[in-house]
């Protein structure tokens, strides 16, 4: 079956872009941009959400070792609260693409919307499942964000960030109600926005 990206010339430098962390109640949104090396096939690339932790870590190392270029960027909690998650995500995508050591000929982005870029850009729904460069970007973003949440777990051990990665699970919501919110919680998100208790920054 023909896809919108099937006819992209093979000699073009294609950057795949994806994010991790749009939905959680805490932590940054992380984005990654990857230009794969067409001469080195990385087996097993897929949507990061469908891969095991071990497989993601393995592929992370293969991607950063064998790709032509990659960059990882972020929008912090403060930017998410100030801009909203949609705009903050687009900003983080811009940052990742601008940080690439090689300028791409075309940028393929997972989802429906594209940031403003000086390159030919295309949004592809389910691109993380169908476009290897986007799959690679999704893996880099997911692994990077999960590692970040482990650091938060050590800093705020009562919240279980290592387990739920900031998503609004029952355990996470219970911890928020019991202990209040931390500086890494998104104050513009429900139900965080409804709470008045804050844990002061140290």
UniProtKB/Swiss-Prot annotation:
Biological process according to GO: DNA replication, removal of RNA primer; mismatch repair
Entry-linked InterPro entries: RNase_HII, RNase_HII/HIII, RNase_HII/HIII_dom, RNaseH-like_sf, RNaseH_sf
Recorded catalytic activity of this chain's protein: Endonucleolytic cleavage to 5'-phosphomonoester
Database matches in SUPFAM superfamilies: Ribonuclease H-like
Pfam families to which the protein is assigned, alphabetical: RNase_HII (PF01351)
Residue span, RNase H type-2 domain: 12-201
GO MF entry, a single one: RNA-DNA hybrid ribonuclease activity
GO cellular component: cytoplasm; ribonuclease H2 complex
Annotated keywords: Cytoplasm, Endonuclease, Hydrolase, Manganese, Metal-binding, Nuclease
Binding of a divalent metal cation, residues: 18-19, 110
Cofactor binding note from Swiss-Prot or TrEMBL: Manganese or magnesium. Binds 1 divalent metal ion per monomer in the absence of substrate. May bind a second metal ion after substrate binding.
Keyword Cytoplasm included in the entry's annotation: yes
Subcellular location: Cytoplasm
Cofactor: Mn(2+); Mg(2+)
EC number: 3.1.26.4
PANTHER family in UniProt: RIBONUCLEASE H2 SUBUNIT A (PTHR10954), RIBONUCLEASE HII (PTHR10954:SF18)
Family: Belongs to the RNase HII family.
Function: Endonuclease that specifically degrades the RNA of RNA-DNA hybrids.
Record protein name field: Ribonuclease HII
Species name: Coxiella burnetii (strain CbuG_Q212) (Coxiella burnetii (strain Q212))
Gene name as annotated: rnhB
